[in-house]
Amino acid sequence: MELTTRTIAARKHIALVSHDHCKKSLLEWVMQNRDLLSQHELYATGTTGNLVQKATGIDVHCLLSGPMGGDQEVGALISEKKIDILIFFWDPLNAVPHDPDVKALLRLATVWNIPVATNRSTADFLIDSALFSGEVTIAIPNYDRYLQQRLK
């Protein structure tokens, strides 16, 4: 696939997602990084977003709960280039009814080449990166060219 570029602004649009067994860990991570995260635009699946708002006072765009379609909403926002970073603390040891949605979400984050943290260590590396608070250009699929090729 042909690529183009997209510039991610210094003020990031960050999606927060977590499975039930990981919510406490994600909340602790958000609290630890509250001052920095409050400088960015936060989105989250329903339960996670409400827990983050209640615990931190940070405004969060709350979507549907993951099993009710929230993971797919986040995926759609990624495809629309409205999410710059995905922080997704998922539980690899417990299956969830919406596992196909989880796989689709991670696939879209990979297709659109956004940074993804699936555990606390990776989230720490990501938020401590010099790129986190600055403008950065990433390579993404050239969808217009892709569509042109498909319509030939």
Curated annotation (Swiss-Prot):
SMART domains in the cross-refs: MGS (SM00851)
Annotated MGS-like domain residues: 1-152
EC number: 4.2.3.3
GO biological process, one term: methylglyoxal biosynthetic process
Catalytic activity: dihydroxyacetone phosphate = methylglyoxal + phosphate
Binding site for substrate: 19, 23, 45-48, 65-66, 98
Classification via InterPro entries: Methylgl_synth, Methylglyoxal_synth_AS, MGS-like_dom, MGS-like_dom_sf
Superkingdom of the source species: Bacteria
Active site residues according to the UniProt entry: 71 (proton donor/acceptor)
GO molecular function annotation: methylglyoxal synthase activity
Enzyme class: lyase
PROSITE patterns: METHYLGLYOXAL_SYNTH, MGS
One cellular-component annotation, GO: cytosol
UniProt entry keywords in alphabetical sequence: Lyase
Free-text function comment from the UniProt entry: Catalyzes the formation of methylglyoxal from dihydroxyacetone phosphate.
Family membership: Belongs to the methylglyoxal synthase family.
PANTHER family: METHYLGLYOXAL SYNTHASE
Protein name as it appears in the record: Methylglyoxal synthase
